[in-house]
């Protein structure tokens, strides 16, 4: 279990404290109360209600069809089950197109029980991040492979190799300067993700970004080895096979993140 007291709910300042103390953060996605309750009781520090629900719950080929109403419904379902994990919810595709639209969507998510909202990308999103933070809404940034940009990327590909790694470093610092309290790095080569994590004052959460991040996140279906109807990424590991039950799988995943055994080189990308 986490060294963060079991009875003490996670807060945004506690995340930064964990980074300063070198304690790895454990994050999983959840979309309903039943799984969220199990994750919360078995060592997960942060729950992400991701727009990945479009693929693993609704059966779409991407996250693009997910709406703010979808996100609010699933966020409220998860929030009712949590005692200690901090709840992060995605802003859906184009909900953050303007600061005003982002504020409306973020307000709905916080009213549904989220404690932080996640925004993909940098660039014009920096204005959105600043706008929300100035209005007391905590923000998690998401860089690297950002699924809402899948059409521009031409598929789900590793990001940040070569010269693109330097731009990723600049973007990471920029989102923190704009006020982000947490940063998800997805499908980023281990060396650049490790460097970014060392340079930033806020925690980084990796998904396919190697062991040098300050924590890890997986889509719950991937962590449990469930067939989501999509190709399994390299960084995915089936913890249900060794855990023997859903609760056991969650504990095995949490322990592996905390002791540094996951992800290993087999579940990460080289430079």
UniProtKB/Swiss-Prot annotation:
EC number: 2.1.2.11
GO CC, any one term: cytoplasm
Residues noted as binding Mg(2+) in the record, renumbered to the chain: 51, 90, 120
Gene3D superfamilies found in the cross-reference section: Phosphoenolpyruvate-binding domains
Active site: 186 (proton acceptor)
Keyword entries, A-Z: Cytoplasm, Magnesium, Metal-binding, Pantothenate biosynthesis, Transferase
Coiled-coil portions: none
GO MF term list: 3-methyl-2-oxobutanoate hydroxymethyltransferase activity; magnesium ion binding
First-level EC class: transferase
Catalysed reactions, as listed in the record: 3-methyl-2-oxobutanoate + (6R)-5,10-methylene-5,6,7,8-tetrahydrofolate + H2O = 2-dehydropantoate + (6S)-5,6,7,8-tetrahydrofolate
SUPFAM superfamilies the UniProt entry points to: Phosphoenolpyruvate/pyruvate domain
Keyword Phosphoprotein: no
Positions that bind 3-methyl-2-oxobutanoate: 51-52, 90, 118
Pfam families the record matches: Pantoate_transf
UniProt cofactor(s): Mg(2+)
GO BP annotation list: pantothenate biosynthetic process
Note describing how the cofactor binds: Binds 1 Mg(2+) ion per subunit.
Family to which this protein belongs: Belongs to the PanB family.
Biological role stated in the UniProt entry: Catalyzes the reversible reaction in which hydroxymethyl group from 5,10-methylenetetrahydrofolate is transferred onto alpha-ketoisovalerate to form ketopantoate.
Subunit structure: Homodecamer; pentamer of dimers.
Descriptive protein name: 3-methyl-2-oxobutanoate hydroxymethyltransferase
Organism: Xanthomonas axonopodis pv. citri (strain 306)
């Amino acid at each position: 279990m986490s060294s963060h007291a079991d009875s003490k709910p996670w807060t945004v300042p506690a995340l930064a404290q964990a980074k300063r103390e070198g304690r790895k953060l454990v994050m999983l996605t959840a979309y309903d109360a039943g799984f969220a309750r199990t994750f919360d009781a078995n060592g997960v520090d942060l729950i992400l209600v991701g727009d990945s629900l479009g693929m693993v719950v609704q059966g779409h080929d991407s996250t693009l069809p997910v709406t703010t109403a979808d996100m609010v419904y699933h966020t409220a379902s998860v929030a009712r089950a949590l005692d200690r994990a901090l709840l992060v919810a995605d802003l859906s595709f184009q909900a953050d197109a303007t600061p005003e639209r982002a504020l409306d969507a973020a307000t709905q998510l916080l009213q549904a029980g989220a404690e932080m909202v996640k925004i993909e990308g940098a660039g014009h999103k920096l204005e959105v991040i600043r706008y929300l933070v100035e209005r007391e809404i905590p923000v998690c940034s998401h860089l690297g492979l950002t699924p809402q940009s899948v059409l521009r990327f031409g598929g789900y590909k590793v990001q940040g190799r070569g010269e693109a790694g330097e731009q990723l470093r600049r973007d990471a610092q920029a989102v923190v300067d704009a006020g982000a309290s947490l940063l998800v790095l997805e499908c980023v080569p281990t060396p650049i993700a490790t460097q970014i994590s060392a340079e930033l004052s806020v925690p980084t959460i990796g998904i396919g970004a190697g062991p040098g991040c300050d924590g890890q996140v997986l889509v719950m279906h991937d962590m449990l080895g469930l067939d989501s109807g999509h190709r399994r990424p390299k960084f995915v590991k089936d913890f249900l096979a060794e855990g023997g039950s859903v609760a056991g799988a969650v504990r095995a995943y949490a322990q592996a993140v905390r002791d540094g055994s996951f992800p290993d080189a087999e579940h990460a990308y080289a430079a």
